[in-house]
């Protein structure tokens, strides 16, 4: 037993010594290749996810996008929390409009919208004059989408759309938006992992989906408040012409009844308050 113990101790000392020597000469133990690390990572998810991931890589290659290097990037991950977020969205939790308003802090936003409008009044007025969209409605959109530009999401849109696809959540949306996202990044020379989004992949203060960024975003800076305000007005103007009303344009922004009522009511409150203060 003593001899066995001494042998084990000697092996351990040799291994420690080897690690010390490598550190001393500035060498680190060899890291696994990207392919090997990818296998390790994907082994942590269900086999069905690996299948979906492989089919997605093949599909995207056919569309002209080689996403192998993105999948192998250490910043890539399949985000399990996205499933929970979709299941617990405010639209699913709210039983009526009053509850929806409580979830989105309507009473606080009645005050915050006035502060936002005062801070961005010149650009809101320009957008209203150019596109014919009331400045209060534009401001209300920012209120519900990004709490008046206080946040733009903590997720990565590439991870979000890939996660949605492999987990079977709104796959009909995920793949087209993933393609639009990669088009946007290619066109603007942006590293996709530098972007932040909501859990549903909506980007910046206006919370545009990638397809909307490509069609309706005006300007060069995703995080310019002026560019975001102009782009929201541009979007609403287009869809008001198609739908025939401002309410229908807001519905195109988010096709949920509670969302539309929240935006329209908040805009009306702001308009009434501003009219009374003049």
Tell what function each PLM region has:
Residues 1-172, 180-190, 195, 211-278:
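Cell-wall glycan-active module
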Residues 197-208:
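Extracytoplasmic ligand-binding site segments that recognize negatively charged/polar headgroups
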Residues 177:
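A contiguous pocket-lining binding segment that forms or flanks enzyme active sites
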């Amino acid at each position: 037993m003593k001899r066995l113990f001494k042998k084990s101790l000697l092996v351990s000392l040799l291994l420690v010594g080897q690690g010390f020597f490598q550190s001393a000469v500035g060498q680190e133990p060899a890291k696994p290749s990207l392919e090997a690390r990818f296998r390790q990572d994907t082994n942590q998810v269900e086999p069905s996810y690996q299948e979906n991931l492989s089919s997605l890589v093949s599909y995207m290659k056919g569309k002209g996008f080689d996403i192998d290097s993105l999948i192998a990037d250490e910043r890539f991950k399949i985000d399990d929390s996205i499933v929970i977020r979709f299941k617990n969205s405010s639209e699913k939790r709210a039983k009526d409009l009053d509850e929806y308003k409580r979830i989105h802090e309507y009473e606080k936003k009645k005050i915050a919208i006035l502060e936002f409008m005062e801070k961005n009044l010149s650009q809101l007025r320009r957008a209203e004059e150019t596109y014919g969209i009331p400045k209060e409605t534009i401001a209300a959109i920012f209120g519900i989408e990004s709490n008046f530009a206080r946040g733009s999401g903590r997720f990565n849109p590439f991870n979000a759309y890939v996660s949605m696809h492999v987990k079977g959540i709104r796959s009909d949306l995920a793949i087209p938006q993933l393609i639009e996202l990669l088009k946007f990044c290619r066109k603007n020379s942006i590293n996709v992992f530098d972007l932040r989004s909501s859990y549903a992949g909506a980007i910046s203060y206006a919370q545009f989906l990638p397809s909307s960024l490509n069609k309706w975003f005006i300007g060069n800076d995703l995080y310019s408040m002026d560019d975001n305000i102009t782009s929201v007005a541009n979007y609403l103007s287009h869809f008001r012409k198609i739908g025939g009303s401002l309410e229908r344009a807001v519905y195109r922004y988010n096709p949920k009844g509670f969302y539309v009522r929240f935006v329209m009511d908040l805009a009306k409150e702001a308009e009434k308050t501003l009219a009374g203060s003049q």
